[in-house]
Regions:
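Juxtamembrane extracytoplasmic/periplasmic/luminal helical "stalk" adjacent to the first N-terminal
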Residues: 1-22, 119-120
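Short amphipathic alpha-helical segments
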Residues: 2, 23-38, 147-151
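Short, basic/aromatic recognition patches
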Residues: 33, 90-115, 143-154
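Extracellular/periplasmic ligand-sensing ectodomains of membrane signal-transduction proteins
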Residues: 42-101, 172-174
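Conserved beta-strands of PAS-like sensory domains
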Residues: 116-150, 204-207
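Solvent-exposed, extracytoplasmic
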Residues: 141-169
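Extracellular/periplasmic juxtamembrane segments that couple receptor/chemosensory ectodomains to their
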Residues: 176-208
Length: 208
């Protein structure tokens, strides 16, 4: 996401210099890179797009420029089709943490009632234009697909390996005693080697 957010920051700055940024203009900027991301990662990406900063667009208080699913169709929320002013994601982790910290964040696992209605993790990275937070690029991964894809690969390296997010919540594990959503922190970390995942707010915990 780092390369994309850098490019998008430049594109948004250029677009705003010409005219006020609207939802349609933002969608046109985001769509090519959002769709390309589905094929760029060695992971089963379910959704990809950009979450606009609140009150940053000329014609809406909030907006998700988002594509998802097997058809990679654009997401249209009920609130977007009736009244865009009613979408308030200010307290949702995948928006709130990048906004407050200025750093990428992995949210979840959680049930994504807004987009997929599935057990999901969201990777989000903030986008800034001249130090102004204008939104976050993000992607969704469905937990069941990630487990099928990565667990066999992890199992080849050991029977007690876990991938955890920044607060120690398990995304997936090869251990039969740990499930997605469990936490490993504090005294539970004794006996584990921690290896950070470059470019992502994730750690791999390997039992010594």
């Amino acid at each position: 996401l780092d390369d994309w957010r850098g490019r998008l920051a430049v594109e948004i700055a250029t677009a705003r210099a010409d005219a006020p940024l609207t939802t349609d203009r933002l969608d046109a900027l985001v769509e090519p890179s959002a769709l390309a991301l589905f094929d760029q990662l060695d992971l089963p990406v379910y959704g990809s797009g950009f979450i606009a900063a609140l009150d940053s667009l000329a014609d809406a208080n909030s907006h998700l420029a988002w594509w998802q699913g097997p058809e990679r169709a654009q997401l249209v929320l009920a609130a977007q089709s009736v009244n865009k002013e009613h979408i308030d994601y200010s307290e949702l982790e995948w928006y709130r943490v990048p906004f407050q910290t200025g750093r990428p964040h992995v949210a979840g696992p959680y049930v994504d009632y807004l987009c997929s209605d599935e057990y999901t993790i969201t990777v989000a990275a903030p986008v800034h234009v001249d130090d102004e937070f204008v939104g976050a690029v993000a992607l969704d991964l469905l937990i069941d697909q990630v487990e099928r894809h990565l667990t066999p690969q992890l199992a080849a390296f050991g029977d007690d390996i876990s991938i955890v997010n920044g607060v120690g919540r398990v995304l997936l594990s090869t251990s039969p005693t740990r499930e997605t959503g469990d936490t490993i922190r504090g005294d539970d970390l004794v006996g584990f080697e921690r290896r950070p995942c470059p470019g992502m707010a994730l750690d791999v915990l390997i039992a010594r």
